[in-house]
C-alpha cells in the first residue's frame, strides 16, 4: 500500500519532456518533487504561476511564493507570474498538456467529483471545473477508499460532479488504473497488494487482463 508521496512519485512517471502540467490541491502538489532531472517540464498553478519547482527546504520558504493550495513553493529559473485571468486563459485555451487532480469519487465512465460533500461547508469548486472541461489528459491521485473504508472508484458518483467522462487514469495507494470501455482497467498493483484486495476495494467494474505487474518507481 502506497503513501501519498509514493502515489506522487508514480504519477511523476507520466510526466513527459516538454509538458505543461497543472497540479491540483493535495497529493498532486507533491508530483513536482519527483520529476526526473533530465526532462524539461513547466508546472502551472491556477493562482498565476508558470515554472513551479519542488517544495522549499525548511527555513528557505518565501511567504510570497505559494500555489493554489496556499502552500509555499519554489520558482524555477525563467518562471513567470500573472493574474488569474491569464492563468485561466491558458487553461481554457487548452495549453495544458496534463492535469493532475485529487478526487472524492471517480466513476467507471470517467466522471469526477472533487469539490463538494453535501452538508459540509466548502469554499467553492475553485478552478477544477475549468480544468476538467478543458484538459484532454486528466490523471486523478487519491486514496482507493475513504476514511470509512468505502470505495472511491464507483459505478456512478454519488457526490455533485465536477466533470463528466473526463478522467483518463487513476493512481491510488493500491493500483494504477485506466478508464476504458466504461470500466476501470487494472494496469499495475502497489507492491505487496493482490488483485483480490484491489477488487474488494473497487465498487466499479474492474477489468483484469493478463499478468498485472507491481508498480516500479
Predicted regions and their residues:
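N-terminal active-site beta-alpha-beta segment that forms phosphate/nucleotide-binding
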Residues: 1-76
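Conserved phosphate- and dinucleotide-binding cores of soluble alpha/beta proteins
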Residues: 3-6, 57-217
Amino acid at each position: 500500500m502506497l503513501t501519498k508521496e509514493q502515489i506522487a512519485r508514480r504519477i511523476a512517471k507520466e510526466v513527459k519532456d516538454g509538458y505543461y502540467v497543472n497540479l491540483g490541491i493535495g497529493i498532486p502538489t507533491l508530483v513536482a518533487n519527483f520529476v526526473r532531472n533530465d526532462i524539461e517540464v513547466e508546472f502551472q498553478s491556477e493562482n498565476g504561476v508558470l515554472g513551479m519547482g519542488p517544495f522549499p527546504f525548511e527555513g528557505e520558504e518565501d511567504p510570497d511564493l505559494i500555489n493554489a493550495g496556499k502552500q509555499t513553493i519554489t520558482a524555477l529559473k525563467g518562471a513567470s507570474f500573472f493574474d488569474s485571468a491569464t492563468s485561466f486563459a491558458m487553461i481554457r485555451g487548452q495549453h495544458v498538456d496534463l492535469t493532475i487532480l485529487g478526487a472524492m469519487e471517480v466513476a467507471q465512465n470517467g466522471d469526477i467529483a472533487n469539490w463538494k460533500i453535501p452538508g459540509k461547508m466548502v469554499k467553492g469548486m475553485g478552478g477544477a471545473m475549468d480544468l476538467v472541461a478543458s484538459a484532454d489528459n486528466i490523471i486523478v491521485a487519491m486514496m482507493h477508499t475513504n476514511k470509512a473504508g468505502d470505495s472511491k472508484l464507483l459505478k456512478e458518483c454519488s457526490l455533485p460532479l465536477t466533470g463528466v467522462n473526463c478522467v483518463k487514469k487513476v493512481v491510488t495507494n493500491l493500483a494504477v488504473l485506466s478508464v476504458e470501455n466504461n470500466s476501470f482497467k487494472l494496469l499495475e498493483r502497489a507492491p505487496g497488494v493482490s488483485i483480490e484486495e484491489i477488487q474488494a476495494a473497487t465498487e466499479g467494474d474492474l477489468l483484469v487482463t493478463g499478468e498485472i505487474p507491481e508498480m516500479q518507481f
